[in-house]
Amino acid sequence: MPPRRKRVSSAPRRRRRTYRRTTAHKHQDRPVHRRRRRRH
């Protein structure tokens, strides 16, 4: 059985810039920011 990777919890939090204004036209067909809540 391969060893489990440790999940880094604080690394995805530093993406706090305002990307939402610049990439808003890309995500109109596919709401990417909606899948933030993940169960583990």
From Swiss-Prot:
Keyword annotations for this protein, in alphabetical order, are:
Chromosome, Developmental protein, Differentiation, DNA condensation, DNA-binding, Nucleosome core, Nucleus, Spermatogenesis
One cellular-component annotation, GO: nucleus
- Residues of the region (Disordered) are 1-40
Location of this chain's protein in the cell: Nucleus; Chromosome
Q: Name one GO biological process term.
A: cell differentiation
GO molecular function, a single term: DNA binding
Give the principal location in a single coarse category: nucleus
Q: In which tissues is it expressed?
A: Testis.
Task: Name the coiled-coil region(s).
Answer: none
User: What does the record give as the function of this protein?
Assistant: Protamines substitute for histones in the chromatin of sperm during the haploid phase of spermatogenesis. They compact sperm DNA into a highly condensed, stable and inactive complex.
**This protein's name:** Protamine-1
Q: What is the lineage of its organism?
A: Eukaryota, Metazoa, Chordata, Craniata, Vertebrata
Q: Which gene encodes it?
A: PBP1
